[in-house]
Amino acid sequence: MAHKKAGGSSRNGRDSNGQRRGVKRYGGEIVRAGNILVRQVGTRIHPGENVGMGRDYTLFATIDGKVAYERKGRDKKKVSVYPV
C-alpha cells in the first residue's frame, strides 16, 4: 500500500508591511505649512529653518515655502523651508 507521510511545516513564509518611511518632499518643492517632509527613525536629517519635528522624528513644514536640504557641518544633514 503506497502511503505518503504528512510533510513537515515550513517555518518561513511571513513578511511585515513596509513602514513607508523616507523623504516625502524633495528640495525645490513648494510646500504648505503642516506638510510632512521626511518620515524617519531617529534624526538622520535634522530640522532647520521653519521645520518642526514630531514625537516620532517626523519633519514637517511650519510655514508655506520652498524646501531646501543642506549640510550641517561635515556629517549632518538638515532640511529647511524658506518663504518664496
Swiss-Prot record:
Transmembrane segments: none annotated. GO terms for cellular component: cytosolic large ribosomal subunit. This is Large ribosomal subunit protein bL27. The keyword Ribonucleoprotein applies. It comes from Desulfatibacillum aliphaticivorans. GO terms for molecular function: structural constituent of ribosome. It comes from the Bacteria. HAMAP family: Ribosomal_bL27. Signal peptide: none annotated. Keywords: Ribonucleoprotein, Ribosomal protein. One of its GO terms (biological process) is translation.
